[in-house]
Amino acid sequence: MNFIQEKDAKKKYIFDWWPAIKKWPEAKVEAHLPEIVAVPESVSEVQEAVKYAYDNNLAIVPFGGASGVLGGIVPEKPSLTIDMQKITGVVEFDQDNHFITAYAGMFGRELEDYLNERGYTTGHYPQSIDLATVGGLVATKSAGTFSSKYGNIEDMMQGLEVVLPNGELFTNRNVPRSATGPYIPNLFIGSE
């Protein structure tokens, strides 16, 4: 896993499409830089980075496509930014059951193109499809142009895998509807 500690290299990790930050003086920008940026290349490295942040009392700021418009990637306290862009691609595509598993760092357009090449679609076309990652689409509980036909992102999901604050991996199982308690994935869907 690579780590970024140089001040100038860390600046890109606090800029998204939020217009206010573009007017900030340099001193304010520098005051909001993360302590460190982790660039993992596997889920196990994401777990290591999250555990490091947990052990060192650092807030975690995930960095995907930087497509946000409200400055959500700007740290407000000592933080570790985790750049998810190298955790990308399709894990599995089950054409018989119309089920695809993709990593959080895969861009929405890449996922859609992958499916289109095989005669399928997600039917999910948010305005940010070219800028947002799968993880970002889930974290913002994304909706899109064809949501009235295909549903929102949460309607398309059958499961998710999440790294918890202590570095452990949580995987929900796809089970029939249950009345035995809350639907745990909803703790993460729309969590931005």
Over which residues does each language-model region extend?
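Short, well-ordered loop/turn elements at secondary-structure boundaries
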Residues: 55-56, 76-77, 156
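N-terminal flexible segment immediately upstream of the FAD-binding catalytic core
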Residues: 1-51, 68-98, 127, 150
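FAD-binding subdomain of flavoenzyme oxidoreductases
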Residues: 89-93, 98-192
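Glycine-rich beta-strand-to-loop/alpha-helix junction loops that act as flexible
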Residues: 63-67
